[in-house]
Amino acid sequence: MPQVGVIMGSASDEQVVQETVNTLEQMKIDYEVRVLSAHRTPDRVREYAQQARERGIQVLIAAAGGSAALGGALASWTTLPVIGIPLASSELKGMDALLATAQMPPGIPVACMAVGSWGARNAAYFAAEILGLKYDHIRQAYEEYRRQLRER
């Protein structure tokens, strides 16, 4: 049963999202990946967000570029934690997505990571920190990773 739902706004985001997937696997976190667009498939975004908790998902990760509405759209339909990964998809090189992800109204938060691959990996590490509060094997995997970072 997936603990994390990874949602990308377009199939063209797959290369960056693969960094998230690889990191979730490293952290021993079960996940699922979906392509859903806040603009092209808003009803499917709503349905996914509303059903996520009953399906066992505990954290949502949303990767989107441009107006990056996906994270906010998901957060508007659920009280699960939503982590946003802004992606560079226009001449603005991700600044538009970064600001859109970060500037959520009070009460509908989206945790905003860095633009691109660093943000993609940190989204998974942040999910590990959240899930590690409840699951010892995830906490231990993340702590081991951090130990290895110190020893480099």
Q: Where would I find each of the regions flagged by the language model?
A:
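Glycine/charged-rich beta-loop-alpha catalytic/anionic-binding loops adjacent to active sites
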Residues: 2-3, 28-32, 79-80, 103-113
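Glycine-rich phosphate/diphosphate-binding loop of Rossmann-like nucleotide-binding domains
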Residues: 2-40
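Short, ordered loop/turn segments at secondary-structure junctions
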Residues: 11, 36-38, 65-66, 87-90, ...
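Short glycine/serine/threonine-rich phosphate/pyrophosphate-binding segments
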Residues: 13-17, 42-45, 64-73, 92-95, ...
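Short, solvent-exposed amphipathic alpha-helical segments in soluble enzyme
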Residues: 20-26, 49-50, 77-79, 128-130
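Glycine-rich phosphate-binding loop
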Residues: 48-90
